[in-house]
Regions:
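Acidic/polar residues at beta-strand termini and the immediately following turn/coil
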Residues: 219, 289, 403-407
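Secondary-structure boundary elements
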Residues: 178-234
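Solvent-exposed loop/turn segments at secondary-structure junctions
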Residues: 175, 215-220, 240-242, 267-271, ...
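Gram-positive cell-envelope targeting signals
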Residues: 1-50, 176, 209, 237-249, ...
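N-terminal accessory/pre-domain segments preceding catalytic cores
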Residues: 19-200, 314-416
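Hydrophobic/aromatic-rich core segments of domains that either
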Residues: 244-311
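Generic solvent-exposed, charged/amphipathic alpha-helical segments
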Residues: 210-214, 250, 382-389
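Short clusters of hydrophobic/aromatic residues that line enzyme substrate/ligand-binding pockets
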Residues: 234-235, 306
Length: 416
């Protein structure tokens, strides 16, 4: 019996072994899952990032606030970059740039339109003025706010110069701020679509849009220049400062096919600068300034700043004087004035001014506006006032107000 038990135990052991082996072999009737080593897939590499690592001097590294944080664009692609909003952005200043300047310009534009909050690049000229190029972008694009004297408050961190590697921070290029711009853009499209049918010519449409801006936007000052959206405020709130007026008007003009750009000027020391629009009326460039329609003290109900020459500009545009469009045609200047003269000091002109002023007074109009198409200094004003007083004997009271521009002047004569 002992040997029988051993044999039975051996038989059972062999049977279990055979069963186990059978279970591990492929059997079409009883398929068994195979246990293999887990395959490990290598993470996909970003080819642009790899190219950047090998040659960072020919790439721009853009940064966003969300993942993936880094985005790499080669110089060659940025040189050819075209705005995603060709009906909204102009190219007047961009078309005059090349090389590094154009790469920097397009880096700002690329970051703005794709909501990147910063970028890094290498430049050959570490002293290059990025702020100057950024201003050119703001003059071509209504989507980039700019204020001449308070610009640093808009940009949260100043531009850092690290050798030849430049780091630019733009914390205002966010999704929420871009949505505000798109809301304003949508409203501008509605304004253009609603131009009445009787405005057929391009000039008539320009006049309608200019009047719309003047009638629906008022000038306000801001307690802080930080984080403000002047374009959005102009279009959607109906209040802004000169930047917002110009952003809105330039965009509306482009939407009807008018070639235009914005222009910035410097005031006297201690005064703020100013922004307005230069646009083509027919084949000629003129200045357009809806801000001054609201803030001007000139007593005229007519539009005073729809199309005028550089002679009527009081601001200095020294930073890019050679780049901006020149407005040399003076035929539209002082279209709102009651008369124009070429001199204030000749007896003949003074007599004519007195005669017209007294005729207007007799008709119940106490104010006469005189456009002087020549430079006028303080000594000439004194001579004019003395001679005017000699001839204006019918008036009990005479008061004169003057506005001096670059090569012209305006005189307001009030008689009683």
């Amino acid at each position: 019996m002992k040997w029988l038990r051993k044999g039975l135990l051996l038989f059972l052991t062999l049977g279990m072994f055979v069963g186990i082996v059978g279970c591990t072999t492929q059997n079409p009737q009883f398929p068994v899952p195979q246990t293999t080593a887990q395959e490990v897939t290598a993470p996909t590499k970003d080819p642009m990032k790899e190219a950047y690592k090998k040659d960072p001097a020919h790439f721009v590294e853009f940064t966003r606030s969300t993942q993936p944080r880094q985005h790499y664009v080669p110089f060659s692609e940025l040189l050819e970059y075209e705005t995603q909003y060709p009906d909204c952005n102009g190219t007047w200043f961009r078309d005059q740039l090349s090389g590094e300047d154009l790469i920097i310009y397009n880096s700002y534009l690329y970051a703005l339109e794709n909501r990147f909050i910063g970028f890094n690049l290498y430049v050959e000229d570490s002293d290059k003025d990025f702020s100057y190029i950024r201003e050119l972008v703001s003059l071509d694009s209504p989507f980039l706010e700019q204020n001449y004297t308070h610009y640093e408050h808009i940009w949260k961190r100043p531009i850092n110069y690290i050798g030849k590697q430049i780091s630019v921070s733009m914390e205002q290029f966010t999704d929420s701020r871009w949505e505000m711009k798109m809301e304003a853009l949508a409203k501008c499209k509605q304004i253009v679509q609603n131009i009445p049918a009787e405005y057929q010519t391009q000039q008539a449409k320009m006049e309608y849009l200019y009047d719309y801006v003047c009638d629906n936007v008022k000038y306000v000052t801001y307690e802080s220049m930080a984080d403000e959206s002047y374009f959005y405020d102009a279009v959607c709130k109906g209040e802004t400062l000169c930047d917002g007026y110009s952003n809105m008007l330039s965009l509306l003009f482009r939407m009807i096919g008018v070639e235009c750009c914005e222009v910035m000027g410097k005031g006297e020391e201690g005064q703020d600068g100013h922004t307005w629009v230069v646009a083509k009326l027919g084949d000629v460039y003129y200045n357009f300034d809806p801000t001054f329609e609201d803030t001007s003290e000139i007593p005229s109900e007519q539009r005073k700043y729809f199309g005028f020459s550089d002679d009527l500009v009081s601001m200095q545009i020294t930073d890019y004087e050679e780049m901006r469009p020149k407005c040399t045609d003076t035929s539209r200047d002082f279209s709102y004035a009651d008369m124009t003269v070429t001199s204030l000091t000749t007896w003949e002109e003074v007599k004519r001014i007195v005669s017209i002023s007294e005729e207007r007074l007799a008709a119940g109009k106490e104010t006469t506006l005189i456009g002087v198409k020549a430079p006028v200094d303080s000594a000439q004003y004194d001579v004019f006032f003395d001679r005017f007083s000699v001839y204006a004997k019918k008036s009990k009271k005479i008061s004169l107000y003057t506005w001096t521009m670059r090569n012209t002047a305006l005189i307001e004569v009030n008689l009683e």
